């Protein structure tokens, strides 16, 4: 996610920078809706506009993973060199920010703030200001994120993809285009698994109480997006504007409708389980792929001619990892600010997204400009 490697001709692919810019905007937008409190989520305005806005932004993570595949596959370095370079740039800021987030509640107690201030920043967290709780969460970092660092789920995923890429690259280097297509087709079938397990049978294609790895397990997950990004860029797959309009737009609309109406129907049920609430928002599903692919193809066609715009997009692209790590510090205050505005809910969400992205990007850019230490902190 962080590093923008050169591709073939040793020139920066600004199209991928644009995709990363769109992805980070979408991610910020998703989290602006996530910060709505449990009480507010029961209100009709959230069920409608939160679903409408949040559904539109689901391609964020798949877009990031596709860019990662496009830039880094196949890995050309030795396994040790790749891990030393990539993982260190990822793991160090991940640990720094994970520790800081988990110390935040304890620090608010030291400063004399009420425990309720914690929920101004982390709506879903238990407001515990004890050092014991903070220490427990820090010790659990090697195993999973806490409710004070929810966004770090993606970093665990990214570390896993980085560990996997040198191994995956060995196959990619010798795989023909048809073999790559075969993998993508099988992966596409695996995208239906979440719905089949929910609406058909829990135990599917060999899964049972003693085996969680079913028939398509080895082709499933985000590695499909990883390969898809590589496949499109390195095989120079392009589509005409006409095909984008007649195929891409309907594809996006159908994917969006499935996501929106599915999520809205789930959130309308009182006491619905978290698993069902998130079902239609699951990233590795056909509806999210249907939204992601047209966006990736569209912004690959856009040419940025303005040096000012290009410079701005590249700056944001370089700051994406830092934005991901740090934006939760500013999310609560930004949301509290827009709550006071007398404007439509949809407008509030857009304002919150733009404000949060602007503040966080500026913060990350300034810290990175301080030198090597700043870049280690922000990635």
Locate each region found by the language model:
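Hydrophobic alpha-helical segments with transmembrane-like composition
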Residues: 64, 71-74, 103-110, 119-199, ...
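Alpha-helical transmembrane segments and terminal signal-anchor/GPI-anchor hydrophobic tails
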Residues: 237-314
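Membrane-interface transmembrane-helix boundary segments in multi-pass integral membrane proteins
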Residues: 54, 249-251, 276-287, 340-361
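Membrane-interface helix-boundary motifs at transmembrane edges
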Residues: 9-13, 76-85, 168-180, 232-245, ...
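C-terminal "closing" transmembrane helix and its immediate cytosolic amphipathic cap
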Residues: 1-8, 300-317, 328-379
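Interfacial loop-to-helix transition and helix-capping segments at the boundaries
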Residues: 49-61, 142-157, 198-225, 259-294
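Kinked, hydrophobic transmembrane alpha-helices enriched for aromatic residues
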Residues: 10-43, 60-68, 88-109, 160, ...
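Transmembrane alpha-helical segments and their boundary/interface "anchor" motifs
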Residues: 54, 58-61, 75-147, 161, ...
């Amino acid at each position: 996610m962080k590093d923008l490697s050169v591709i073939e001709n040793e020139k920066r692919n600004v199209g991928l920078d644009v995709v990363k810019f769109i992805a980070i905007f979408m991610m910020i937008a998703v989290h602006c809706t996530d910060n709505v409190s449990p009480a507010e989520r029961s209100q009709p305005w959230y069920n409608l506009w939160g679903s409408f806005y949040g559904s539109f932004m689901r391609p964020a993570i798949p877009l990031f993973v596709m860019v990662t595949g496009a830039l880094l596959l196949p890995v050309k370095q030795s396994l040790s060199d790749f891990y030393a370079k990539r993982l260190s740039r990822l793991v160090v800021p991940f640990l720094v920010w994970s520790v800081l987030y988990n110390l935040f509640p304890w620090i608010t107690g030291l400063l004399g703030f009420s425990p309720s201030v914690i929920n101004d920043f982390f709506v879903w967290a238990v407001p515990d200001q004890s050092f014991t709780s903070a220490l427990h969460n820090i010790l659990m970092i090697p195993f999973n994120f806490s409710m004070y660092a929810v966004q770090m789920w993606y970093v665990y995923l990214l570390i896993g993809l980085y560990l996997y890429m040198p191994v995956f690259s060995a196959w990619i280097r010798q795989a023909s285009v048809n073999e790559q297509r075969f993998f993508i087709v099988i992966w596409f079938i695996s995208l239906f698994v979440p719905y089949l397990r929910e609406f058909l049978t829990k135990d599917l294609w060999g899964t049972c109480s003693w085996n969680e790895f079913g028939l398509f397990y080895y082709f499933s997950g985000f590695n499909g997006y990883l390969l898809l990004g590589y496949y499109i860029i390195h095989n120079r797959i392009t589509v005409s504007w006409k095909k984008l309009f007649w195929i891409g737009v309907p594809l996006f609309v159908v994917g969006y409708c499935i996501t929106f109406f599915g999520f809205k129907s789930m959130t309308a049920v009182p006491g619905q389980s978290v698993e069902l609430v998130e079902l239609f928002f699951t990233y590795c599903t056909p509806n999210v792929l249907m939204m992601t692919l047209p966006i990736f193809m569209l912004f690959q066609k856009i040419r940025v001619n303005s040096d000012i715009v290009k410079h701005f997009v590249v700056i944001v692209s370089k700051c994406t990892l830092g934005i991901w790590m740090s934006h939760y510090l500013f999310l609560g205050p930004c949301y509290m600010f827009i709550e006071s505005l007398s404007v439509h809910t949809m407008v509030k969400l857009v304002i919150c997204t733009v404000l949060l992205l602007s503040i966080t990007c500026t913060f990350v850019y300034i810290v990175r400009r301080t030198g090597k230490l700043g870049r280690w902190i922000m990635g």
